[in-house]
């Protein structure tokens, strides 16, 4: 039996992490605007989340005094171009029973690529799930255009996604 449940956006979260020159990292959060999870038994078989890119925050203490500057730069056309692409989405296409892996399509800056959420922990009673999605920002055009500065920023962005269903 398939059961589609809305995501509780106030208790769900997406934490991001990016690395610079392999030495230090920045991390923070973006809010989930809306979404749903489709459950079949103990597995998630479908669903989607819409991430509100306009809610980006920094939570690490490195350069915390410059948080507004960092977030503004990440929201700029150099990176996520939030003015033109205020949301990102992840649409679940399937999951592999017993592997804690969920597959889907991630859309950032209007570009959609297949991605994998790994190490997913499912809680069948509360209908919640937490997992890690790592993506190559270059595939989505998240880069300084033609700049050597781009080499200072690691290509991999990690998102820890924690979703709670509304029961």
Q: Which residues does each predicted region cover?
A:
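Low-complexity, acidic/polar, glycine-enriched regions of mature
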Residues: 1-167
């Amino acid at each position: 039996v398939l059961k589609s449940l809305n995501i509780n956006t106030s208790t769900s979260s997406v934490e991001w992490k990016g690395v610079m020159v392999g030495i230090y990292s920045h991390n923070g959060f973006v809010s989930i605007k809306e979404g749903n999870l489709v459950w079949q038994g103990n597995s998630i078989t479908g669903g989607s989340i819409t991430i509100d890119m306009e809610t980006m925050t920094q939570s690490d203490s490195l350069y915390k005094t410059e948080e507004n500057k960092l977030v503004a730069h990440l929201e700029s056309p150099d990176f996520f171009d939030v003015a033109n692409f205020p949301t990102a989405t992840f649409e679940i296409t399937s999951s592999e029973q017993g592997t804690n892996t969920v597959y889907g399509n991630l859309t950032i800056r209007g570009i959609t690529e297949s991605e994998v959420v790994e190490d997913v922990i499912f809680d069948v009673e509360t209908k919640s799930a937490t997992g890690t999605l790592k993506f190559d920002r270059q595939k989505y055009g998240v880069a300084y255009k033609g700049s050597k500065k781009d080499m200072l920023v690691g290509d991999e962005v990690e998102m820890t996604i924690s979703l709670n269903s509304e029961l």
